[in-house]
């Protein structure tokens, strides 16, 4: 069920209150990208302890980061229709309990990553936690409309975390994957911010559609999508993938571009929502194409 369909008047079971604080759908996408990074880092099978340890450890630390995000944005979330149902915003889960919950998740995640993967992965994941929960959420998001660009690195790190879990290094190939997510994030998020701009006006957060208007935001979405399409060529150019990935990346990129150009020409909230949803499908299929090309072709 989407955020917009939730209601602050509905009392969730206690376990689910904590579960939603981890933003499970976003966490799933992050872990998926981390797993792709693991498999792309080796020509063979990822060792099972590393695979499962990496999945669980990264999931736990990501969940902890999102819980801290909910805590910091408690007052902001309460003002927004999309997020007012969250247990942190309604007060069903107290700040102290969120802090304890985040410490438990984060500590377990660090222990698992240290023991099943390697210290590098643990420290990188912890740095990503700090980058998202503190630098982005606390410092950048309320300060600048370029928050999602400047703070986007933390959200783009999962493939590098997966790569490091397997190789105990960070090669150029890992950073190619990070770059793809980094330049994907602005058009993905700004599509959401456009059709939720009234929410962001209420929140007081300086999101680009609020501070610079619809047309400027749409232009930036188009520009970043073009940069994204160029960035997705890097895995092929540098020999990480073959023709199957290249063709998939071109087709998916043109589809994404068609959405954003249509949005630029004739904006509607409904089309912005479709563009936002397709952006998630786009990233999932793009990374799946990398995996298929790597192992099966």
Swiss-Prot record:
Catalysed conversion reaction: heme b + (2E,6E)-farnesyl diphosphate + H2O = Fe(II)-heme o + diphosphate
A GO CC term attached to the entry: plasma membrane
Residues passing through the membrane, by range: 26-46, 48-68, 96-116, 120-140, 147-167, 174-194, 218-238, 245-265, 276-296
A Pfam cross-reference name: UbiA
Known EC number: 2.5.1.141
UniProt xrefs under InterPro entries: Protohaem_IX_farnesylTrfase, UbiA_prenyltransferase, UbiA_sf
Biological processes, Gene Ontology terms: heme O biosynthetic process
Top-tier EC class: transferase
Keywords linked to the UniProt accession: Cell inner membrane, Cell membrane, Heme biosynthesis, Membrane, Transferase, Transmembrane, Transmembrane helix
Metabolic or biological pathway, per its Swiss-Prot or TrEMBL entry: Porphyrin-containing compound metabolism; heme O biosynthesis; heme O from protoheme: step 1/1
Role summary: Converts heme B (protoheme IX) to heme O by substitution of the vinyl group on carbon 2 of heme B porphyrin ring with a hydroxyethyl farnesyl side group.
Other observations noted: Carbon 2 of the heme B porphyrin ring is defined according to the Fischer nomenclature.
PANTHER family on file: 4-HYDROXYBENZOATE SOLANESYLTRANSFERASE, PROTOHEME IX FARNESYLTRANSFERASE, MITOCHONDRIAL
Family as reported in the entry's similarity comment: Belongs to the UbiA prenyltransferase family. Protoheme IX farnesyltransferase subfamily.
Protein name from the UniProt record: Protoheme IX farnesyltransferase
Organism: Polynucleobacter necessarius subsp. necessarius (strain STIR1)
């Amino acid at each position: 069920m989407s955020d917009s369909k939730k209601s602050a008047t509905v009392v969730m079971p206690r376990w689910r209150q904590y579960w939603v604080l981890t933003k499970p759908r976003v966490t799933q996408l992050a872990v998926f990208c981390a797993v792709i990074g693991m498999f792309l880092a080796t020509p063979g099978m990822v060792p099972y302890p590393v695979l499962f340890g990496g999945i669980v450890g990264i999931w736990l630390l990501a969940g902890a980061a999102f819980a801290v995000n909910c805590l910091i944005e408690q007052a902001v979330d309460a003002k927004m229709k999309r997020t007012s149902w969250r247990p942190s915003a309604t007060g069903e889960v107290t700040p102290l309990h969120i802090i304890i919950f985040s410490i438990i998740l984060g500590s377990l995640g660090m222990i698992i990553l240290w023991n099943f993967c390697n210290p590098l992965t643990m420290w990188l994941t912890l740095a990503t936690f700090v980058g998202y929960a503190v630098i982005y959420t606390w410092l950048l998001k309320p300060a600048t409309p370029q928050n999602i660009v400047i703070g986007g690195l933390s959200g783009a790190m999962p493939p590098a975390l997966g790569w490091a879990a397997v190789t105990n290094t960070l090669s150029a190939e890992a950073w190619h994957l990070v770059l793809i997510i980094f330049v994907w994030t602005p058009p993905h998020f700004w599509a959401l911010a456009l059709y939720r701009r009234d929410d962001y006006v209420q929140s007081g957060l300086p999101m680009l559609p609020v501070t610079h208007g619809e047309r400027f935001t749409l232009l930036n979405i188009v520009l970043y999508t073009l940069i994204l399409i160029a960035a997705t060529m890097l895995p092929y150019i540098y020999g990480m993938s073959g023709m199957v990935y290249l063709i998939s990346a071109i087709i998916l990129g043109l589809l994404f571009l068609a959405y954003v150009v249509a949005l630029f020409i004739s904006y509607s909230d409904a089309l912005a929502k479709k563009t936002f949803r397709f952006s998630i499908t786009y990233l999932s299929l793009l990374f799946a194409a990398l995996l298929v090309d790597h192992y099966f072709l």
